[in-house]
Amino acid sequence: MDYKLQLPSVLDYFTTLVQSDDDFPLLETAVSLAQDEFPKMDIQQVLDEVDVLCARLKRRVLPHSDALDKLRALNTFFFEDMRFAGNVNHYDDPHNSYLNVVLSKRLGIPISLAVLWLELGQSLGLKVHGVSFPGHFLVKLDLVYPQEGHVVIDPFTGESLSRDELADRLIPWLPGAKLGKPQAISDDALAFHLQAAEPRQIIARMLRNLHEIYRRQDDQERLAKVRARLAVLLPDN
């Protein structure tokens, strides 16, 4: 009797990746989203490309550098040397969400650029997190004693954002904003929206971005694939 090896489907693979929150592989899971569009993509090759970038970055950081020095090295490497940037001219291109393409073209949207930036930051031992800010995904570095507080960065541009700039970005998303009512942003309100996003939340936002793009394009085949992933990722929703 002949036995044929049954290879797991891309959805089976995705299901395995997102089973547990205890050890959720953000980068690998984000890369795997591209399998719907690029079924022959070699995920390990993409992960290896990121590892090479991490190794190159580490060689640029001096021993005993503090967190802010590491952050400067990271941003210089990512935005200036590697020239990762936001895809301003084609923001709604779904390929901006596929990390194999983002790595190749050095262009993406805030959340896809953030996933790569976070991986590089973590390779330096930095306490970096994604921030699911309304309307625009951000990243932040948590500082520890003696450098307390955090630095919030727009991964689309590489800019560090002040409290006032963050408040200005938040105001349009608050109740009453469309009525033109003046808004005052409390520290507690801002802190709430600057909470660290869990990996599962980041992947969900990436999928919802794709869902919205394909919905507008009335691409039912791709919509179905995105919905299947969301159902696996968020079974209780």
Language-model regions: role of each:
Residues 1-237:
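A structural boundary/capping signal
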